[in-house]
C-alpha cells in the first residue's frame, strides 16, 4: 500500500501470498491458518541457523527479539508494521494468522525450503517467495485463489483482469487473469 499511496484507495491489495485481501484498510477476504498449527510452524526451523520466522496477521508482522539486524532490515522492507515480541506463539497472537514467512540469511531454496517441506507439507502449503523467503499458508491458499475470490466478489471475469508477477509465488495469480506479465527481474 505504501508504494501506491496516491492510488491506494482505488485499489485492492492481495496480501500475505493470497491469504488476505485488503481495500481501504478493510479486510475483503481472509483465509487464516488454523491456530493449532502456528506453534509447529514457528518452531519448524529452530535447528536451522540464520532462519527467522515472521508471523503475519492483517496489518502487522510479528518477529522475535532474538532476530538479527539483517533479518529486521529485510522484514521492514516488506512489512510496514513490525512488532518485536518475546514469544511468537504466546496466547492472543494466534487468531487470524494469514501466513508464517521464514527469512533465510542464506539461500532459502536449498536451505530452509527442504526442511519446511519435510516437516510441514501436506497439512500446509509451502512456497518459495523470494531468494531468502519461504511462505507457509493454509492449504490451497495462493494469489490465484485470492484473485478468483476478488473476481467473484466484484462480478468480473478473468478476461477483465491484469496482473504482474516477479517470483514463483505469482504463478497462480498470473494464470487467474486474462492479461499477465512476468517482470524482467523474475
Identify the function of each model-found stretch.
Residues 40, 44, 48-164, 168-173:
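Conserved acidic, metal-coordinating active-site core of Asp-based
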